[in-house]
Amino acid sequence: MSIRTDAPTRREQILREAARLFAERGFHGVGVDEIGAAVGISGPGLYRHFPGKDAMLAELLVGISERLLAGGRRRVEEADGDPRALLSALIDGHIDFAINDRALITLHDRELDRLRDADRKRVRQLQRQYVELWVEAVREVYPALEEADARAAVHAVFGLLNSTPHLGPAGALTGRTTTAALLHRLARGAFAAAADGN
């Protein structure tokens, strides 16, 4: 029997470094040899794990969309019908993503159009489901908010939270806890402001 440790698998290491390099230099600006060197294997050695760069990009972007949706659904279950707790948990979960996976945000912004049609459609489908989960949560807390306004507010909050790559290098953040608390307050304030207009 194999026991899982906290150490990332070789495949996870490859994906993490590919995301970092793609975010820094663009998908077409990075070769398999560079990704391989970043994880200590030859470029051709990557083909034992992935058929090519396209497969890495697809796994990164489809994978994060799947994880965000699964995390959102888990938070719905854990909130046990408390709409304020759910909205707070959704915000916190997305903040964790926005702080910890900044390269994936950059990658999504710049490289989504590089995915094969089927993968791009899958990402968009997962994202729509994630947005709708948030829209329902926002409308539970702010029932006077029209559905279209709630959806617009959710997209605006995603823009706010997903701005973390623009805060400078990872080490330039004022501290994870301070940044997370600020983002949480701003997100809650945005939803409250949207509801105040009704």
Regions found by a protein language model. Give the residues of each.
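Short, structured motif recognition centered on aromatic/hydrophobic residues
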Residues: 13, 19-22, 68-69, 91, ...
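Hydrophobic/aromatic-rich alpha-helical bundle segments in the mid-to-C-terminal region
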Residues: 105-109, 120, 124, 139-187, ...
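Helix-turn-helix
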Residues: 2, 10-13, 17-55, 59
